Amino acid sequence: MLTALLLSGCMGNNLGEVRATEPLQTGTFQKPYEQLAACTKQRIETDSWIFGQPIVQSSQDTNRPLIRVYAIYSRSTLFEVTFQPTHSAMTTVEYRRGYDGHGTQDQTWAIIEYCSRQAAPPTPGADRRP
């Protein structure tokens, strides 16, 4: 019984396991990848979730232009969303779900779509005249 408890507690905990899975949903958006990732991360952090508030983290790949946003709840990786620019100034987004992330895909994808329609934040100092 202890083994079963330990195994069930470890299911889905490993971010590497989530990253190794095929994406459940993929899309391309006409928004710079940094802006889309930042907006998505902020909305995931502030939206209400049926299970409670997840811990949301992000990382930028050092070898290529790729941002990863992932949510953790109760020491388990719920999902990861990756943002990567394309050659045509678009962003490819991929959603992967962890073992305990059931019920998060629709809400997460709705956040991504919402963020893709938002205006770009103003550039600091853009309203100044030389």
At which residue positions do the language-model features occur?
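Bacterial Sec signal peptide processing site at the extreme N-terminus
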Residues: 4-25
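Sequence contexts marking disulfide-bonded cysteines in secreted/extracellular proteins
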Residues: 11, 38-40, 114-116
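Post-signal-peptide N-terminal segment of Sec-exported extracytoplasmic proteins
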Residues: 25-67, 78
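Mid-chain, structured segments of secreted extracytoplasmic proteins
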Residues: 61-94
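C-terminal partner/receptor-binding element of secreted or periplasmic proteins
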Residues: 92, 96-130
